[in-house]
């Protein structure tokens, strides 16, 4: 039985109506909310950097130098430096494991696995200073967490405990027939009851959901849950999941309590069911990442330090494969192997259902570290994978802009897109919907809005997300804000002129911390400011465009760069040459998009999106956009189908419409 992969955009609390106690309040559980619980409104989207300024950069050399200067012993690990804990009583060396403090080599952030104390590099320095003065460092519960945050965490733990007590092990259901029917519904018929019991999996009848526990590694206390609901779609099973606490605070490495201290090998999977199937078939230690192929939180790296070999088997599509390569960078590629998706190498649960040899698939995993020079023999399988999965190679498809899919084919990592349009044409409004479309499909997005502030941008995006004017329906605000908050969306707090190095450092930090794969910079001129002379300004712009191009390539991250056009005659259509500055921007770009306003003469106020450059396969063309003021959307989402016109990429006058105003001929360069 085939399985449809999970999508990172979760439907918060909407699939468990039987367990709701009323309308969902902010921070309250949708399963155990009782009557009389006061609704709280809180909108808080992640922003980068912290309000105090850019994230402080620290190198591993500086960290080592500081530890030596303070007389703190340490060992070099794969992703972290290991040191004795500073957050408990000083113990003699033989009293327990001495190195329980893990310091991230990239960011300097730390986690003490003995006390669960965590923080940034500056917090660690402060703890060292307190230690030298004889003052105990604050424990994990004595930090400066917001009162509302603490209350929300307590509610989540209490709600998780209630659900856990109501759930039953599958082996304790009424009869074998109910157990078989439940397993069949989730596509896990081959999984033995013993495997499910070993991992602590339970079943919640009221919601028809599997329950996966999150136990604290220190004291085995229940910290949260993940609930999984299955839906039959033909021969396939589609899964929807929900977590307590909410998704961005859920850091459960499912299967961690079963890992022994001497285990030196582990397989990371994209779902709990895959971990169960793989462990049953091979006996190899397996862990499921809490957010699948979407993100590997750096806070989990300390728990993976003990393993000399890490195999990533995250799924059966190209996005999982790309995520595996990205995660291997964090984990240290030298110890990582990757299972490449293919017909004979599907996700572990499907492989078990099909009777494939999972041990053989693991042995065929490819090393993540590449040499500087390779032969075609080493690339052969990857080339075949791209040919066999051409639709996935084309990238993530837009749901709101199907016409854009016909031209660009999809949104791909590692590319640079330049977007321009006349002043006042709605560039920010369009590009926010363009990016939101991808974000709702699990593309981790970082916004750098240098022209308008984040509150105004978030208001635009929330309106587009809800496709309605929330000003007139404030009673729906909490519901839509809850859903919007679950998106993998982050904002830089910069506004106006900024130094390019500071911006790039923040982007690099976001890629590492949140596995960002799409960065939107709106816009280049506002980021640069107006201080330089005209000649210096053009050179500075070329340098910045080149820096963004290099960043996109080095980090396998797509950058969408909004640039104002030159001042030209309003009656003329914009062209690729209309982009402000030298030709550097259009030369470096993989894609050039132009928002045309009233230029293709089908009526006043009409706008068109023109693809004037497409390096992926050369298709260029134009299609109309219709703006809805109520929902602030340009897409044909729920509207009549827009007409697409493909054109040849050549110099000369713009294509003219046919006699009927319909679609003209199409051709490919």
Swiss-Prot record:
EC top class named in words: isomerase
Gene Ontology molecular functions: 5'-3' DNA helicase activity; ATP binding; ATP hydrolysis activity; DNA helicase activity; lipid binding; single-stranded DNA binding
Record field: compositional bias (Acidic residues): 141-151
InterPro entries associated with the record: DNA_helicase_DnaB-like_C, P-loop_NTPase, TOPRIM_DnaG/twinkle, Twinkle-like
Membrane topology, as annotated: Peripheral membrane protein
Signal peptide: none
EC number(s) from the headed UniProt entry: 5.6.2.3
Coiled-coil region list: 141-167
Biased composition range(s): Gly residues: 659-669
Chief location: mitochondrion
Gene Ontology process terms (BP): mitochondrial DNA replication
Catalyzed reactions per annotation: ATP + H2O = ADP + phosphate + H(+); Couples ATP hydrolysis with the unwinding of duplex DNA at the replication fork by translocating in the 5'-3' direction. This creates two antiparallel DNA single strands (ssDNA). The leading ssDNA polymer is the template for DNA polymerase III holoenzyme which synthesizes a continuous strand
Transit peptide segment: 1-43
UniProt region (Required for hexamers formation and DNA helicase activity), positions on chain: 120-378
Annotated region described as Disordered, given as residue ranges: 133-154, 638-669
A matching Pfam family: AAA_25
Subcellular location: Mitochondrion matrix, Mitochondrion nucleoid; Mitochondrion inner membrane
Region described as Primase-like domain: 215-335
Lineage: superkingdom: Eukaryota
PROSITE patterns reported in the protein's UniProt record: SF4_HELICASE
Function: Mitochondrial helicase involved in mtDNA replication and repair. Might have a role in mtDNA repair. Has DNA strand separation activity needed to form a processive replication fork for leading strand synthesis which is catalyzed by the formation of a replisome complex with POLG and mtSDB. Preferentially unwinds DNA substrates with pre-existing 5'-and 3'- single-stranded tails but is also active on a 5'- flap substrate. Can dissociate the invading strand of immobile or mobile D-loop DNA structures irrespective of the single strand polarity of the third strand.
Domain comment quoted from the record: N-terminus enhances protein stability and hexamer formation, which is important for DNA binding, and is required for DNA helicase activity and, ultimately, for mtDNA replisome processivity.
Name of the protein in question: Twinkle mtDNA helicase
Originating organism: Gallus gallus
Name of the gene this protein is made from: TWNK
């Amino acid at each position: 039985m085939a399985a449809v992969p999970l999508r990172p955009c979760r439907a918060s609390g909407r699939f468990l109506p039987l367990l709701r106690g009323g309308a969902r309040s902010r921070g309250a559980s949708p399963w155990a909310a009782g009557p009389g619980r006061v609704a709280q409104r809180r909108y808080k989207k992640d922003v980068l950097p912290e309000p105090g300024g850019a994230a402080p950069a620290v190198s591993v050399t500086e960290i080592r130098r500081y530890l030596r200067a303070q007389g703190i012993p340490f060992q070099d690990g794969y992703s972290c430096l290991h040191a004795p804990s500073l957050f408990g009583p000083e113990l003699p060396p033989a009293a327990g494991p001495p190195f329980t403090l893990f310091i991230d080599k990239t960011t300097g952030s730390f986690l003490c696995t003995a006390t669960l104390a965590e923080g940034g590099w500056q917090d660690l320095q402060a703890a060292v200073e307190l230690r030298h003065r004889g003052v105990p460092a604050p424990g994990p519960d004595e930090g400066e967490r917001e009162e509302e945050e603490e209350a929300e965490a307590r509610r989540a733990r209490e709600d998780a405990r209630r659900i856990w007590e109501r759930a039953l092990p599958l082996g304790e259901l009424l009869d074998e027939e109910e157990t078989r029917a439940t397993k069949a519904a989730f596509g896990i018929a081959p999984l033995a009851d013993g495997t499910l019991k070993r991992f602590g999996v339970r079943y919640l009848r009221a919601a028809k959901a599997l329950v996966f526990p999150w136990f604290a590694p220190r004291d085995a206390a229940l910290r949260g849950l993940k609930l999984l609901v299955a839906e039959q779609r033909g021969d396939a099973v589609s899964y929807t999941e929900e977590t307590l606490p909410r998704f961005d605070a859920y850091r459960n490495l499912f299967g961690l309590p079963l890992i022994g201290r001497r285990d030196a090998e582990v397989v990371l999977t994209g779902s709990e069911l895959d971990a169960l199937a793989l462990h049953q078939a091979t006996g190899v230690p397996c862990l499921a990442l809490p957010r699948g192929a979407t993100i590997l939180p750096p806070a989990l790296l300390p728990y993976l330090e003990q393993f000399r070999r890490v195999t990533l088997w995250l799924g059966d599509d190209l996005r999982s494969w790309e995520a595996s390569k990205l995660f291997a960078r964090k984990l240290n590629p030298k110890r990582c192997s990757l299972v490449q998706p293919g017909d004979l190498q599907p996700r572990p649960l499907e492989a078990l259902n099909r009777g494939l040899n999972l041990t053989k698939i693991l042995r065929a995993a490819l090393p993540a570290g590449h040499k500087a020079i390779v032969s075609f023999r080493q690339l052969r399988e990857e080339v075949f994978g791209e040919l066999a999965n051409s639709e996935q190679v084309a990238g993530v498809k837009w749901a709101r802009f199907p016409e854009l899919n016909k031209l660009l084919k999809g949104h791909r990592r590692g590319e640079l897109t330049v977007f321009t349009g006349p002043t006042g044409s709605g560039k920010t409004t369009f590009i926010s919907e363009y990016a939101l479309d991808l974000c709702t499909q699990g593309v981790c997005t970082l916004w750098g809005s240098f022209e308008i502030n984040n509150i105004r941008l978030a208001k635009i995006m929330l309106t587009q997300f809800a496709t309605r004017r929330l000003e007139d329906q404030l009673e729906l605000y909490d519901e839509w804000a809850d859903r919007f908050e679950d998106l993998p969306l982050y904002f830089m707090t910069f506004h106006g002129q900024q130094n390019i190095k500071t911006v790039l450092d923040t982007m690099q930090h976001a890629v590492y911390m949140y596995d960002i794969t799409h960065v939107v910079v709106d816009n280049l001129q506002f980021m640069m400011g107006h201080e330089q002379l005209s000649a210096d300004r053009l050179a500075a712009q070329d340098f910045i465009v080149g820096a963004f191009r290099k960043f996109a390539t080095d980090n396998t991250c797509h950058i969408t760069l909004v640039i104002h056009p030159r001042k030209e005659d309003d009656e003329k259509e914009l062209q690729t040459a209309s982009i402000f500055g030298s030709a550097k921007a259009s030369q470096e770009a993989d894609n050039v998009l132009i928002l045309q306003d009233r230029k293709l003469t089908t009526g006043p106020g009409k706008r068109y999106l023109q693809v004037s450059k497409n390096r992926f396969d050369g298709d260029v063309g134009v299609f109309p956009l219709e703006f809805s003021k109520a929902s602030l959307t340009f897409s044909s989402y729920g509207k009549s189908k827009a007409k697409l016109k493909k054109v040849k990429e050549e110099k000369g006058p713009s294509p003219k419409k046919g006699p009927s105003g319909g679609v003209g001929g199409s051709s490919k360069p």
